[in-house]
Amino acid sequence: MLQPARTKYRKMHKGRMPGSAHRGSDMTYGEYGLMSLQPGWITSRQIEAARIAMTRHVKRGGKIWIRIFPDKPITKKPAETRMGTGKGGVEYYVAVVKPGRILYEMEGMTPEVATGALKLAQAKLPVLTKIVKRADLSL
């Protein structure tokens, strides 16, 4: 699963997600992509589950790019622990996603195979997404 090799600080504030994505909103690698329509956190497990579903559907042909990286640590306190005594330990990592962000890109396959694979990936993700083509975005 994806997670940072080293971080400057172990723990992070929760943060806010106002507005839409400015960075990562253009398709740079593939022909077909998956674009987020709402803000949210996507865990490294969800990113990996969607990637596996896509690669199994595509079988041999094509290439897939993951355009998001889970770099935000999420902490959790142990069960039945009293309040106070500091923040809990890091449990997992998430990628912060805003509307308009491209999550995955694909190329080297027919449109039917690409849309089928991206539909499988949509089912694995906790945010609403839409399938986009490079030709549609470059208007």
UniProtKB/Swiss-Prot annotation:
Transmembrane segments: none annotated. CDD domains: Ribosomal_L16_L10e (cd01433). One of its GO terms (cellular component) is cytosolic large ribosomal subunit. Residues 1-23 are annotated as: Disordered. Pfam families: Ribosomal_L16 (PF00252). InterPro entries: Ribosomal_uL16 (IPR047873), Ribosomal_uL16_bact-type (IPR000114), Ribosomal_uL16_CS (IPR020798), Ribosomal_uL16_dom (IPR016180), Ribosomal_uL16_sf (IPR036920). SUPFAM superfamilies: Ribosomal protein L16p/L10e. Keywords: Ribonucleoprotein, Ribosomal protein, RNA-binding, rRNA-binding, tRNA-binding. Residues 7-16 have a biased composition (Basic residues). GO terms for molecular function: rRNA binding; structural constituent of ribosome; tRNA binding. GO terms for biological process: translation. Part of the 50S ribosomal subunit. Belongs to the universal ribosomal protein uL16 family. Binds 23S rRNA and is also seen to make contacts with the A and possibly P site tRNAs. This is Large ribosomal subunit protein uL16. The lineage of its organism: Bacteria, Pseudomonadati, Myxococcota, Myxococcia, Myxococcales.
